[in-house]
Amino acid sequence: MSIDFSNAVVLVTGANGGLGQEFVRQALARGAAKVYATARTPRAWDDSRVVPLALDVTDAASIDAAASAAGDTSIVINNAGVTTANDSLLTGDVAELRRVFETNFFGAVAVVRAFAPVVKANGGGAFVDVHSALSWWAGTGAYSASKAAFWSASNSLRVELDRDGTHLLGLHMGYVDTPMTAGIDAPMSTVDQIVTAALDGLEAGEYEVLADDVAVGAKQGVSAPIEAAYPSLARA
């Protein structure tokens, strides 16, 4: 199912910066009539087509209020996400681990649940679920686990949404140059590269976009022996 942005109404979660901000910019550039730019505390925008809207993906009442306020939405960019300084599943603070899952998994799924009837009522439309190469490689603890869980949920949601004529695209990528990756010394894609790949894929009707070589390699690694992905586990 190809998706046309011409005169579409788009809602972006986590829109204050990073990938979210770029999704807002590119949706408008592709012809969207309106973009709801959501965040816990939404920023001001200098474009009248952008509507700042409060949305905390960890708060059910906030999600429901946003779904009611943005009842003309036809495309949802499910982008909000968090990480934590110590996300070790063995030693990380349990409250912090739960916070990561509340945003990256439960919050993201809650957004789809709340907006699915809205998108259906507006002609079917689409969701873009922003995942990570870490959906398939445990480079971190809680963050990787939360993204793996969300990837699995998106696969289930995709089948359910398709029955109502709604498309779901999953986006995977390695490191992206955003505030979340500040201080990480590794090759990174730009937000422009990742969002362009995602929206090109959505317009083409793709189910999944692997936006860089890191994501491609991570998915291929799922079918490889465990030792190939995690060399420290290799036995002499």
PLM-predicted stretches and their roles:
Residues V112, S146-K147:
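Active-site helix of classical SDR
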Residues D72-T73, V119-H131, R163-H167:
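Active-site loop of short-chain dehydrogenase/reductase
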Residues G170, T178, A182-A224:
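C-terminal helical subdomain
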Residues N16, G20, V24:
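N-terminal Rossmann NAD(P)H-binding glycine-rich loop of SDR-like oxidoreductase domains
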Residues V112-R113, N155:
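A short, exposed helix-loop element centered on a Lys and neighboring polar residues
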Residues D47-A60:
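Rossmann-fold cofactor-recognition segment
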Residues T83-R98:
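Conserved mid-core segment of classical short-chain dehydrogenase/reductases
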